[in-house]
Curated annotation (Swiss-Prot):
Source organism phylogeny: Bacteria, Pseudomonadati, Pseudomonadota, Gammaproteobacteria, Enterobacterales
Swiss-Prot/TrEMBL catalytic activity: (R)-4'-phosphopantetheine + ATP + H(+) = 3'-dephospho-CoA + diphosphate
Binding site for ATP: T10, F11, H18, G89, L90, R91, E99, W124, S125, F126, I127, S128, S129, S130
Gene: coaD
Species this protein is from: Edwardsiella ictaluri (strain 93-146)
Signal peptide range in chain numbering: none
HAMAP family xrefs: PPAT_bact
GO terms, molecular function: ATP binding; pantetheine-phosphate adenylyltransferase activity
Main enzyme class: transferase
Protein name: Phosphopantetheine adenylyltransferase
Gene Ontology cellular-component terms listed: cytoplasm
CDD domains in alphabetical order: PPAT
Quaternary context: Homohexamer.
Length: 161
């Protein structure tokens, strides 16, 4: 039986912390879908298409990882993809309460959907896409927190904005 996991998020932009989680998930499961949410309510800096393209570029070396955009309920997307494992990253205890609520709602919507929580490597445990964008907006160096291609795209987007 093949085990397909989904690692969902907005990934605006995809950080080294996200890359750490998807890489580790790729070693744990037969296949992983990096599912990029449209998330229009969050007003992403990058379009869904741009986020999907960047994610495909930085995960190209992970042969069992596919990247898809989605705009429906996660449980419905998981069902459509034939996946019953949801991978989520936990950086701090403060993430846990929200993730617990999401896991319970997803299980209510799809009883066979299990949530698996991974902690990022310590080097990435304090990073969030929002924090990285804020640092970059104020002229800080974010190269250590993002894959090279993503850092370039972020700096170009902010410069051209």
């Amino acid at each position: 039986m093949s085990r397909t996991a989904i690692y969902p998020g907005t990934f605006d932009p995809l950080t080294n912390g996200h890359l750490d989680i998807v890489t580790r998930a790729a070693h744990m499961f037969d296949s992983v879908i990096l599912a990029i949410a449209a998330s229009p309510g969050k007003q992403p800096l990058f379009t869904l298409e741009e986020r999907v393209a960047m994610a495909r570029e930085v995960t190209a070396h992970l042969t069992n990882v596919e990247v898809h955009g989605f705009s429906e309920l996660m449980a419905h997307f998981a069902q459509r993809q034939g996946a019953n494992i949801l991978v989520r990253g936990l950086r701090a205890v403060s993430d846990f309460e929200y993730e617990l609520q999401l896991a319970n709602m997803n299980r209510h919507l799809m009883p066979t959907l299990e949530s698996v929580f991974l902690m990022p490597a310590e080097a990435w445990s304090f990073i969030s896409s929002s924090l990285v964008k804020e640092v970059a907006r104020h002229g800080g160096d974010v190269d250590a927190f993002l894959p090279e291609q993503v850092a370039r795209a972020l700096m170009t987007r902010l410069r051209d904005a």
